[in-house]
Amino acid sequence: MESFEGQGDSRQSPDNERGDNVQTTGEHDQDPGPGPPSSGASERLVPEESYSRDQQPWGQSRGDENRGWMQRIRRRRRRRAALSGHLLDTEDNVPPWLPPHDIAPYVARNIRDAACRAVKQSHLQALSNLILDSGLDTQHILCFVMAARQRLQDIRRGPLVVEGGVGWRHWLLTSPSQSWPMGYRTATLRTLTPVPNRVGADSIMLTATFGCQNAARTLNTFSATVWTPPHAGPREQERYAREAEVRFLRGKWQRRYRRIYDLIELCGSLHHIWQNLLQTEENLLDFVRFMGVMSSCNNPAVNYWFHKTIGNFKPYYPWNAPPNENPYHARRGIKEHVIQNAFRKAQIQGLSMLATVGEPRGDATSETSSDEDTGRQGSDVELESSDDELPYIDPNMEPVQQRPVMFVSRVPAKKPRKLPWPTPKTHPVKRTNVKTSDRSDKAEAQSTPERPGPSEQSSVTVEPAHPTPVEMPMVILHQPPPVPKPVPVKPTPPPSRRRRGACVVYDDDVIEVIDVETTEDSSSVSQPNKPHRKHQDGFQRSGRRQKRAAPPTVSPSDTGPPAAGPPAAGPPAAGPHILTPPSARPRIMAPPVVRMFMRERQLPQSTGRKPQCFWEMRASREITQMQQEPSSHLQSATQPTMPRPSWVPSVCALSVMDAGKAQPIQSSHLSSMSPTQPISHEEQPRYEDPDAPLDLSLHPDVAAPPAPRAPYQGYQEQPAPQAPYQGYQEQPAPQAPYQGYQEQPAPQAPYQGYQEQPAPQAPYQGYQEQPPPQAPYQGYQEQPAPQAPYQGYQEPPAHGLQSSSYPGYAGPWTPRSQHPCYRHPWAPWSQDPVHGHTQGPWDPRAPHLPPQWDGSAGHGQDQVSQFPHLQSETGPPRLQLSSVPLVSSSAPSWSSPQPRAPIRPIPTRFPPPPMPLQDSMAVGCDSSGTACPSMPFASDYSQGAFTPLDINATTPKRPRVEESSHGPARCSQATAEAQEILSDNSEISVFPKDAKQTDYDASTESELD
């Protein structure tokens, strides 16, 4: 990279010489920096420069020169680097995408209103179903709208593909079969964190992933690097708490006061609001009342909000006009004493005056608009009614509390539809005994049967020819509803290719091949109960979809003979169907009813927990099928099959069978996170079993121990077939795709008997024959990583280091082995023990667990008792290794129970925390005011709810070389403080004990920022 030094960059060049010629470099330097403004003066002054500089005291002139000079140099270098793109990287440097126009910071309401306006267009109807019909609050609407916005922007300019994949993870989401209807699209967006007015905003990358019905099948899906907001210090947490509390209180105020709150927050100028933004006299008086409440309010959070917003601590009352002016309210015709009375009354009543008087809280949940809204605020009513059809939006107005009529979809399908006009069904004619002539009776009786349905004229009472007075009230005849003639049901034609469910799978799919003919018995037996059961799967929830998918479900009384229906959909009363053998009949696609319940048919009917996803249903079905004999297909569906076993993982990778060629397809295409798929190793999904304690002596990647063998102690002395071939452990997968395995000369001996090994070790077999694997090293993926508790870092035997008898020991720390030349070239990180946890390059095979520590070094025990909350959980530490030097400063927390079953660690990128997580919500961080349900940044506010509170973990240092450095880690004075802070009786607080927390309202304005 070139050094950015021009002519004037050396410190020796005189102060006012322009370092670069503006014409040659093309820089246009608007700010020449300190120094005489005329560049023409420089030639004249150069010879006398040294003399004039000598007249000043030397240090002062050097200081001035350096200050001004270096500023200018830095500015010039910065600009030059930015122009040539050197700050980022030299080749194909793309400047970050910026919006083409200036963007005003969004107000949440504006975005929401824009969403309401947008969904008037017909092609955005789906968006309106998603956003408006679900009655969400503004925050959720914003999430949806931002996602849609990203999607649109991403269509406009293609996806941002980072070449090296720096900080990005992406999967290729391919659907293996043409007909799988679900595709994924993502959109990314560079935006700023929502800091008001963009002071101190961070640039972050947002990503939305959309599933689309018939998307293109191969698309890169990116998910951005995770951005976590920086942890807030105690003052910020206090501020967040106050702001959240005020927002919570505002939600409980009447709408007119909420509006004034919003105006003050938007404008920040009371005078401007008073003069320009209040429309009716009632609005003006509301403002006066609000100011009265604020002037007497003693809630610290509201006080803080008010003074922070208006920008000073002594509010001025805008109705007090200067003496030479006619005050504004007088011009509006409001008397002075009215204003004074309203103000005093509000001062006396305080905050309770603003609260709603028993009206429902109308924040997008209540569908009713309360009377006080419409009655009190005439101005808003005029605004809203200016256009009756569409919701009207005024920038100063909160959106209507009532759902606009245009968005009401339709009444739910369960109730019969109420028509607004009278019909014979809704308004049956009152039956009164009116005398009519016999002739009209006969005419009526003759004409009735031909009428297709009862109409209002024909439904007049039909009386018997000889009425008896007793029977008169009872002989009112209703015409019986016409019985539908049983129509023979034709087998429905093969359906169109239109896909309906979220993940509906048809019989020609590769994902799951269900052959209707092969399972006639089970399908025909288990089908009848289906229409009478509540649907258990989430795919068939909407009535509309069922009505479309199924032929009309006919109750047994209505149908004709049972054989009339298609073979799989007979009524429950039907006997066993006579089915032609599958070879004889033409292969038709399953009729829609079968398709509707196709996957559900094989599920156990237990009322246990419902399967959440397709793979889970698939897994539980296969498991129950394995447990039944093939003969048990004939058992009736009323008898429930085995419930889903609790150990079935929620996502399991099953090899699926292709319809034509019955060979298993690797299902790693089907789910991007299936456990067998070789995802990049930072993404390796892990499952945890919540009850087993975190057993840190075990290697995190041991999935399940193959065959019960002797527990893991001295691996080195065992015969070769079971030795974990030490040459293997240092090899972190990500660096090189394992070509090195074949060439390694040193570790030949342990490999000896690999082909003869018993079955439990099956994944390793054929090791020498493996060709160097392809890019994602598919062939390698099932090998359980070396089954040894991390043996430290072992040099390969060729280096001649003896390895001692217990597994945690890695040889003495000789300076020779630490030297970067001598350590093994693939050793993932440096050789020296570190205090606390280092974060090495993440290699799932070799986590760097600090060795165990026994209490042998003198003052060990009281150091253990220093953590009272630890003692209660784990009991006295059971120490497994006898003579390992202490390496970690928080050693006692590593004492772990004896290895039981290997657990599957939590999916996280970071090494396990050095102390058990403590939810400091319980410990209590000093908050002002109530705990607010709508509080943002809850984790920040709770002092980082999931940060380990390890106070005396020092920053990682290199160990001292004296032998005493292997005793317990030296604790600085921080440990003494930590002991006070963590002792039983004291609550954990972030401040030292004597510092009193200052109140914001007492502090000056500059401190607030």
Curated annotation (Swiss-Prot):
Domain of life: Viruses
Gene that this sequence comes from: EBNA6
Biased composition, class Acidic residues, residue ranges: 381-391
Signal sequence, start to end: none
Organism of origin: Epstein-Barr virus (strain GD1)
Protein name, per record: Epstein-Barr nuclear antigen 6
Pfam families linked to this entry: EBV-NA3 (PF05009)
InterPro entries from the UniProt entry: EBNA-3/4/6
Quaternary data: Interacts with host CTPB1; this interaction leads to gene repression, but also seems to interfere with the repressive function of CtBP pre-bound to DNA, leading to EBNA6 mediated up-regulation of many host genes. Interacts with host MYC; this interaction enhances MYC stability. Interacts (via N-terminus) with host RBPJ. Interacts (via N-terminus) with host histone H2AX; this interaction facilitates H2AX proteasomal degradation. Interacts with host TP73; this interaction inhibits TP73-mediated apoptotic pathway.
Disulphide linkage map: none
Chain intervals with Pro residues compositional bias: 479-495, 563-574, 899-916
